[in-house]
Amino acid sequence: MASNNVAQFAAELKMPAGVLLEQLQAAGVQKASEDDALSETDKARLLDHLRKSHGATDGDKRKITLTRKHTSEIKQSDATGKARTIQVEVRKKRTFVKRDDVSEGAEQGQAQVAEADDDAELKRREEEARREADLLEKQAQELRERQERLEREEAERRAREEAAEAERRRAEEEAAAKRVAAEAAAAQQQAAAQQAAAAEQQEAASTQSAQDEARAAAERAAQREAAKKAEDAAREAADKARAEQEEISKRRAAAEAEARAIREMMNTPRKAVVKAVEPPKPVEPPKPAEAKGTLHKPAKPEGAQARPAVKKPAGAAAPATTAPAGAGDRNKKPGAGKGGWQDDASKRRGIKTRGDSSGGVDRGWRGGPKGRGRHQDSSTFQAPTEPIVREVHVPETVSVADLAHKMSVKASEVIKVMMKMGQMVTINQVLDQETAMIIVEELGHRAVAAKLDDPEALLVEGETGTDAEQLPRPPVVTVMGHVDHGKTSLLDHIRRAKVAAGEAGGITQHIGAYHVDTPRGVITFLDTPGHEAFTAMRARGAKATDIVVLVVAADDGVMPQTKEAIAHAKAGGVPIVVAINKIDKPDANLDRVKQELVAEGVVPEEYGGDSPFVPVSAKTGAGIDDLLENVLLQAEVLELKAPVEAPAKGIVIEAKLDKGKGPVATILVQAGTLNRGDIVLAGTAYGRVRAMLDENGKPTKEAGPSIPVEIQGLSEVPGAGEEVIVLPDERKAREIALFRQGKFRDVKLAKQQAAKLESMLEQMGEGEVQNLPLIIKADVQGSQEALVQSLLKLSTDEVRVQIVHSAVGGISENDVNLATASKAVIIGFNTRADAQARKLAESNGIDIRYYNIIYDAVDEVKAAMSGMLAPEKREVITGMVEVRQVFKVPKIGAVAGCMVTDGIVKRSSSVRVLRNNVVIFTGELESLKRFKDDVKEVKQGFECGMSVKNFNDIVEGDQFEVFEVTEVARTL
């Protein structure tokens, strides 16, 4: 815009109006205020004046210098950690020279030289700006480190001062904090002021020439030096404050120790003596180092300081200052030598105890010197005035006696505390860790959860030492999805086998592990159940997998177990490949499936996500090759590797008890190589691998990474999901397995003991709660776990499912005997009872039910629980009666002559008496007559005589509401 006055021209030049007025007056242009008009002639005069003042001549108008300035902002953290915005200004200057026709070549060379100089100057300034930014960042980093060091030292200082008095500590900390904050604030304000001054100088220097810029650079160097000096001063002030605080803390600790020693001396109780004596002379307060007494070793008096600390023999001679024994006997009262309480006390004091420095020398009436010294020595015991707080390490399980020993108290004290807490325990009772820690805190000590002397630490040490070469391994792919969406059929088409036909009801109830050789490589598949009862089994599958293939039916969409599978995959951080199955069906809708999956957070690649969507058909085989290609592509991106020449490690996929083979476990090798004959440890089970079969039932000698195998030879059935590891010898495996078994048993018993009182109160509050005891035997560990969880979910407030026992294997006589004792029903899931068990069950009337589909087992147990529910009682109004006349009959009472106005009246019905439509009595009919004859019922429109049991206050005009109570069966 055109600048018509001084203020507008100053704004255009980005300079103060006052400075512009001074320059105009120096140029001979008389302008008094900012609002005065400014002409082009005035501007030309000002320009000539400025050129002359800077050394330019009128004839030299061939060269024009342009200065350009660019300002940007960067984020930089200061010493306090806060982000601050720093403005960075880059200046560029270019000189243009007007060419002459005569010396055009020379002028061009000069212009190039000038441009080269300008470029060099620009590079130099950019380098200087970059160095300044680096220096600022380095200074900020040093300030942060210094602040962290100061905070760390401040925390240590506070920890050392915790024993000091609260008020003094708080006041001194506040004073120190204020002083340090004031110094730091002063240093920061000084640095900020210097930076602001530097910024103002840079702003003012923007309108000056290259000479002014050189001066500004020198000034910035001086400012940096000043900032550095300010930081050094702040650091010295902080160090000085810290030294002062440490000196104050030391003096305070010494003063407190001296005060504590004086308090202990003043609070020491005097011992009872027979003879009244003068009070002893005051003892000098001990030094702080001498104030540390224990329960067994009181602080020594002044006269005993010269005695050596080593123990003396029992028969050592008394010191030279001790009077003869006869002199002490002469001062005894008559009868004092006959076993009075004074002699008993002296004998007890003479017993040699651990920590006693007297060596067993009698310090009582016999051993003391005559007169004053004797009585002074007898009153030197100092009882501890402050409780001794011990740090008690509490293991997972501990007996009452061991816990008392750890706290140096009698077991009876612990039993008293337990009785106050409502628990009756014995000295050998095992307590769990939580209860034991509560008792320790109750007795005034500090409880710490102890680290176990765990032999499993050897496993961790062994793992750190393995340094085998990492080689590529096949991917482990878990097939997940809703029930009946075609997971097993899809895998069946890949394996070219009929697996789904072998599953009961066409649904998968086990985890199947298979490895498939494809033209593109080996893939290991885990087929998980889709039924809602197998949540834990699906979680184990997601834990052991590398890639999840999510099978969704094109005609069904996203279902509850589909959402659960997505949650398992996301929790494990596993990539998902979506297989949209059943695309051959006429009602398949791929777009709807994609939209539903996008709502669950699974976005297809064509929508910008990272999950491949592959339409497949397990029936026709369409899309199978694309699915395998996408799976192997994901595996290639993951770069899966595992050591091969190393001891094997893996996870238990499934476990069962075979009648002929014993415990059988299906494991997935995750690292190393498992060979036949290796010693394996899986949870609480261990043993040597006697036989190893692949998924087709064929024997194999070894299994590498990502290969599933079935092993035999374990000591018991391991839990599904347990980690499998190969150990060098059987002794170590047995030691760790037995340790785990004992730990599990102790923790279980301790928790049962802790829950006894709670369960007793619960049973008292529950009242009439029906229990359905069940014994569950299944073929594999996963099915047993799923069935137990599904049945426990059926429990309600009125009927509760009680799992008496659950295990893997066939139904034996022990199970029948347990069912007889607990009156339980035995459920066999894919198992059968042997001949002896069946015969025993028939003789004892035990119900054994067999199932092979989890739906049926859950439904029948639910029906049995419904039968145990108390029936619901409902009232049905059968008729209304109006009282027309009341008769008083001796020995009977009031008899109402009535008219049945609605419904029917039966002799066995109940009745409510209504007066003015308000219920005044509810009871039963005592008699129902018609013309002096007893009748069973009277219908509408007939008259009858009625009497109500225990109610004679019948008035004409009353109404009788006749009703019956019926019971209705309830369902869950």
UniProtKB/Swiss-Prot annotation:
Chain segments carrying region Disordered: 48-85, 99-385
Compositionally biased tracts (Low complexity): 105-114, 182-205, 313-328
Residue stretches of biased makeup (Pro residues): 279-288
Limits of the tr-type G domain: 472-641
Residue spans crossing the bilayer: none
Keyword tags: Cytoplasm, GTP-binding, Initiation factor, Nucleotide-binding, Protein biosynthesis
Residue ranges with Gly residues bias: 357-370
Keyword Cell cycle: no
GO cellular component: cytosol
Places the protein is found: Cytoplasm
Region (G5): 617-619
UniProt cross-references to CDD domains, sorted A to Z: IF2_eIF5B (cd01887), IF2_mtIF2_II (cd03702), mtIF2_IVc (cd03692)
Comp. bias (Basic and acidic residues): 48-63, 121-181, 212-263
Region named G1: 481-488
Region (G2): 506-510
Job of this protein: One of the essential components for the initiation of protein synthesis. Protects formylmethionyl-tRNA from spontaneous hydrolysis and promotes its binding to the 30S ribosomal subunits. Also involved in the hydrolysis of GTP during the formation of the 70S ribosomal complex.
Name under which the protein is recorded: Translation initiation factor IF-2
UniProt organism field: Burkholderia lata (strain ATCC 17760 / DSM 23089 / LMG 22485 / NCIMB 9086 / R18194 / 383)
Gene name in the database record: infB
